[in-house]
Amino acid sequence: MKIILFLTLIALATCELYHYQECVRGTTVLLKEPCPSGTYEGNSPFHPLADNKFALTCSSTHFAFACADGTRHTYQLRARSVSPKLFIRQEEVYQELYSPLFLIVAALVFIILCFTIKRKTE
């Protein structure tokens, strides 16, 4: 129990937060800066933008921001060669309730039922 408390105390003292992002290789990733006056620590080209955002080219990379309050935000980008949703065809094969075929069949069943009920009552 004391070991768990000690490890928790060490983790809180370092104040290191981790952020993970998946992206398609070669695209640009838009991320929000964790703190406005942070120091960038990394080897990837970093492009600061308005509203405390920044852009990075997607590649498998590891970088960090060190904030003035001592908090360190570590980012891990994981690049994929192809997006899995890029080439998937969205074919939803389902039949609507009010399709013409359904309406024709329903009308025929209704007419047949009307005639059979009428014959039974005679």
From Swiss-Prot:
Motif (Di-lysine motif): 118-122
Signal peptide: 1-15
SUPFAM superfamilies: Accessory protein X4 (ORF8, ORF7a) (SSF117066)
Topology, Intravirion side: 118-122
The entry's keywords: Disulfide bond, G0/G1 host cell cycle checkpoint dysregulation by virus, Host endoplasmic reticulum, Host Golgi apparatus, Host membrane, Host-virus interaction, Membrane, Modulation of host cell cycle by virus, Signal, Transmembrane, Transmembrane helix, Virion
Ranges of residues in domain X4e: 16-81
Transmembrane spans: 97-117
Cellular localisation: Virion; Host endoplasmic reticulum membrane; Host endoplasmic reticulum-Golgi intermediate compartment membrane; Host Golgi apparatus membrane
BP terms from Gene Ontology: symbiont-mediated perturbation of host cell cycle G0/G1 transition checkpoint; symbiont-mediated perturbation of host cell cycle progression
Main location: virion
Virion surface domain ranges by topology: 16-96
Membrane-topology annotation of the record: Single-pass membrane protein; Single-pass type I membrane protein
One protein family per Pfam: bCoV_NS7A
GO cellular component, one term: host cell endoplasmic reticulum-Golgi intermediate compartment membrane
Disulfide bond entries: C23-C58, C35-C67
Entry text on domains: The di-lysine motif confers endoplasmic reticulum localization for type I membrane proteins.
Subunit architecture: Interacts with the spike glycoprotein, M protein, E protein and the accessory protein 3.
Function: Non-structural protein which is dispensable for virus replication in cell culture.
Misc note: Bat coronavirus HKU3 is highly similar to SARS-CoV (SARS-like).
Protein name, entry field: Protein 7a
Organism, scientific name: Bat coronavirus HKU3
